[in-house]
Design a protein with these regions (language model features):
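Amphipathic alpha-helical recognition patches that constitute DNA-binding helices
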Residues: 14, 71, 75, 89, ...
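Alpha-helical elements of Rossmann-like donor-binding domains used by nucleotide-donor carbohydrate transfer enzymes
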Residues: 14-17, 34, 88, 92, ...
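Conserved acetyl-CoA-binding loop-helix of GNAT-fold acetyltransferases
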Residues: 76, 82-95, 118-122
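Conserved GNAT acetyl-CoA-binding A-motif
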Residues: 97-109
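Conserved catalytic-core motifs of GNAT/GCN5-like acyltransferases
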Residues: 108-109, 124-141
């Protein structure tokens, strides 16, 4: 059963195994505190663990971009990809975003990320334009009304 939940201090091992491999336990626990903050740079923000029963398999995030719109992201850790976790997690995140009063969701996906593009289309996102990301990668900007 897939669920979304806040990261817990005991999740430090998961995030240092799959994502922040150079962090100490203390720094990972501090980072989890930042994950759970309600705002980031003064904007509404949620970063939630994707849990498959008790195992954390990745995370989803949303941050307010403009009034009524949040940008979302998902990361499923490599050993758990291609098992439907991202679809289930984003579906739940869309419900949370709507309950928080947002009516539009945006996402940015690298043009060469075929699985993520297919996922966004399956979830009803539409490409609105193309851009170059802050990291210099060609991306699609997608939106979905909720």
């Amino acid at each position: 059963m897939i669920s979304l939940r806040s990261f817990r201090p005991c999740d430090w091992q998961v995030i240092t195994q799959y994502q922040y491999t150079n962090l100490s336990q203390a720094n990972a626990v501090n980072l989890i505190g930042e994950f759970n903050a309600p705002t980031y740079q003064g904007k509404f923000h949620k970063l939630l663990a994707i849990a498959n029963d008790t195992q954390v398999v990745g995370y989803v995030s949303m941050i307010e971009t403009v009034e009524g719109t949040v940008s979302i992201g998902v990361e499923v850790y490599a050993p758990f990809r291609r098992q439907g976790f991202a679809y289930a997690a984003i579906s739940q995140l869309l419900t949370i975003a709507n309950a928080c009063g947002y009516h539009t969701v945006s996402a940015q996906v690298r043009k060469d990320n075929t699985p993520s593009l297919a996922l966004c289309k399956k979830l009803g996102f539409a490409v609105v334009d193309e851009a170059i990301s802050r990291r210099g990668n060609p991306v699609y900007n997608l939106v979905k009304p909720i």
